[in-house]
Structure formats: structure tokens, C-alpha cells
């Protein structure tokens, strides 16, 4: 994407001016973002976020909006609710004259995404929910969130820094600090409090059965698996995928895995311009099959075995994986500490490699 997308404004049914942009071409993907930390201009200055959005814009018309009270939208509000964000979305959809589109709801905005999809089944082709919940109490009664709510009334800077680190994980401190700066510019403490108090009593669980769109439920293992399972079980065409870790951002730390799930779900190429070399050094271009490996319970394993023995297990995992990839013509794209991302020229080769890996690890475990 060259340059910055043009910011436009839409008027809601209750009179608020909502900032939005659309970039790219093709069928639309509307991302509600992670309110209230939403600022259309500032988020594009954060490389990880910009790269994530540009992936959509490379193959679709990608739409983002700042909900009322946040970012570049009208900032003076008296209340915040699921209904208000639905009205904001309706205004942008009408302004862009979108007949149908893919809708993405992240964390807090998942409530509005579910409500909109239930009410406008004819417009939502697909629904993607990232770390979403259906009852405000499932999120705001968490001990960590209660601590942050208390911090909000005492120190705005401490609140945003702590909330950002909680959101992304303490291992991504630099990114969390940049996002905390965005957070402070995107919203005032008063509006932050309005959102937390206004959404605490929200409940869209009764609308799940009315969602007709195929739905992809993406959830972090340590951010409420039971909630995600309940959502997936209540939507008739839902598919649940669980990822390791705690980060509430889809672009950190395992963006490739998450992107491949989204791309597969809505019919995008995972890497439209990818050129890779297999183990024989032969270049290939076009559609690729991506294989991911992962050590389940890696953190718990390291705690149980200790650093020295844990590293021995990781080294053996790497040795077996690389040898098996070579045998099956796979190309190592990158390693992620406790897992690999590899590409293959066909689904068959990837499946055969996956089966071989399972057998190799089973044989190694049996010999220990």
C-alpha cells in the first residue's frame, strides 16, 4: 500500500460522525478493531498493525472505523454500548454502499459483530471473531481487568501501559509501549470508563443462534477456551481454532499461523507473492501448502524439565523436524522456538510429512 488511506466520515442514525477508511479492491472486509484503543492514523504507524492490514488490502477492500468516542471519530459521548457500535458500523456500511462483506470483531468489538451479524444476515458473508466474548462479565469480572479498572481511576498512564502489556504479553514490551501511546491518544479516561462500565452488563449470547454466516472463532488458549467453545457450539456454521499463548493481538507473536487460518476461511492466498525454495534449492511460485508444527504445552514443559533439559528437547525437536522436512521436499520458512512453519508444493506432500513427523516423534519418545 502506498501512501495513507483517505479518512472519510459517516453520520450515524443518532447523529454521530464516524471516521473510516477503505483501501484495496475487491470484496469488502470490515474490521471493527479493538475498541476503545482505536486510532485510524496512529495504528498505521505501528509496523506490525500496518503489515497485518495490508495483507487484507492486497486482496480485498479493507475497511476500518473508529467507533464513537475514539480516535478520529466524534469524541464527546455520554454512554457506550453494544448498540452504539452497531449504529457506527451501520453508518459506515451505508456510506460505502456495501451489499455484503466479511465482518471481523476483536475482543470488545466481538459483541457488536455478533449483534450485527444476527440482525443483518443478508449482508454478512462471513464472520471472524478474535478472542471474543458474549457476556461482559466474562471479560470484565476477570481479576486482571478488575485491577485495571481500579488503576484507571488513579493513574491513566499506568492504566494504559499495564493494559497494553496485559494485551500483548510482557515479552512484547516495545510494541506494548507504542500501543499504550496510541491508547492515550485514542480515548480519554472518561470514555474508557464508559466503555468498561457500559459493556460490563452486555449479553449477546441469545443472538448466537440467529447468526447465519459461516463463522471462524479464533481464540488464545489462555484467554477463555470455554467461552470460545460455547460461541462455536451456538452458531450453526462455526469453526473453532485455538492458538497457544495469551496475546490478544492476531498479529503477535504467531501472525503467520493466524493469517493462514483467516486466508483459508475467506478464500485468500496465504502469501500471494510467495517465492520459496525447497530442500533441493528449486524455486516455486504460486499456491503453496503451509505446515505448522508446535510443541503443545511448551511453557509447562520448560517449567517441569528446567532450562537445560528443556533446551535438549527443543534441539531434538528441531533435528527431527528438519530431517523429515528434507525427506519430503519441504521448505523451512521459519522456526518459532517451539514450532516450525514450512511450505510444500502440494497438499499431499505436506500431509505425508505431517504423518512422518508424528511417527518420528512417537518413535523418539518410545526410545527414551
Predicted regions and their residues:
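Ligand-binding pocket scaffold of soluble enzyme catalytic domains
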Residues: 2-271
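Residues at secondary-structure transition points
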Residues: 47, 80, 308, 312, ...
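Short, flexible active-site-proximal loops enriched in glycine and acidic residues
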Residues: 104, 130, 328-329, 367-368
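A structural signal for long alpha-helical coiled-coils and helix-turn connectors
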Residues: 200, 299, 362-365
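Active-site phosphate-binding and catalytic loops of NTP-dependent enzymes
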Residues: 274-276, 361-368
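Catalytic NTP-binding/metal-coordinating core of nucleotidyl cyclase/transferase enzymes
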Residues: 276-360
Amino acid at each position: 500500500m502506498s501512501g495513507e488511506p483517505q479518512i472519510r466520515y459517516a453520520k450515524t442514525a443518532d447523529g454521530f460522525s464516524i471516521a473510516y477508511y477503505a483501501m484495496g479492491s475487491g470484496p469488502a472486509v470490515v474490521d471493527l478493531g479493538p475498541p476503545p484503543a482505536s486510532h485510524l492514523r496512529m495504528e498505521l504507524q505501528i509496523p506490525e498493525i500496518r503489515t497485518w492490514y495490508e495483507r487484507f488490502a492486497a486482496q480485498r477492500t479493507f475497511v476500518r472505523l473508529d467507533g464513537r468516542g475514539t480516535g478520529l471519530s466524534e469524541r464527546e459521548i455520554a454512554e457506550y454500548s453494544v448498540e452504539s457500535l452497531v449504529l457506527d458500523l451501520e453508518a459506515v456500511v451505508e456510506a460505502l454502499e456495501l451489499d455484503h462483506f466479511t465482518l471481523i470483531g476483536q475482543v470488545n468489538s466481538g459483541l457488536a459483530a455478533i449483534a450485527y451479524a444476527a440482525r443483518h444476515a443478508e449482508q454478512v458473508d462471513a464472520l471472524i471473531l478474535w478472542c471474543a466474548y458474549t457476556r461482559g462479565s466474562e471479560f470484565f469480572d476477570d481479576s486482571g481487568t478488575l485491577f485495571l479498572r481500579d488503576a484507571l481511576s488513579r493513574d491513566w498512564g499506568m492504566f494504559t501501559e499495564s493494559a497494553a502489556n496485559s494485551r500483548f504479553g510482557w515479552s512484547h514490551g516495545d510494541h506494548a509501549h507504542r500501543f499504550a501511546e496510541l491508547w492515550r491518544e485514542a480515548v480519554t479516561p472518561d470514555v474508557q470508563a464508559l466503555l468498561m462500565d457500559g459493556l460490563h452488563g452486555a449479553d449477546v449470547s441469545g443472538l448466537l443462534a440467529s447468526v447465519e454466516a459461516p463463522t471462524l472463532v479464533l481464540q488464545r488458549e489462555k484467554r477463555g477456551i470455554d467461552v470460545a467453545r460455547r460461541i462455536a457450539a451456538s452458531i450453526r456454521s462455526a469453526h473453532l481454532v485455538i492458538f497457544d499463548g495469551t496475546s490478544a493481538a492476531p498479529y503477535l507473536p504467531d501472525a503467520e499461523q493466524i493469517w493462514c487460518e483467516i486466508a483459508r476461511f475467506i478464500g485468500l492466498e496465504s502469501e500471494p507473492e510467495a517465492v520459496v525454495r525447497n530442500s533441493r534449492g528449486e524455486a516455486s511460485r504460486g499456491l503453496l501448502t503451509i505446515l505448522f508444527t508446535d510443541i503443545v504445552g511448551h511453557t509447562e514443559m520448560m517449567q517441569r524439565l528446567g532450562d537445560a533439559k528443556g533446551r535438549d528437547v527443543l534441539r531434538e525437536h528441531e533435528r527431527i523436524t528438519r530431517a523429515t522436512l528434507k525427506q519430503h521436499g519441504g521448505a523451512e520458512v521459519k522456526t518459532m522456538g517451539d514450532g516450525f512453519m514450512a511450505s510444500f508444493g502440494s497438499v499431499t506432500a505436506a500431509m505425508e510429512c505431517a504423518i512422518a513427523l508424528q511417527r518420528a516423534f512417537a518413535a523418539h519418545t518410545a526410545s527414551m
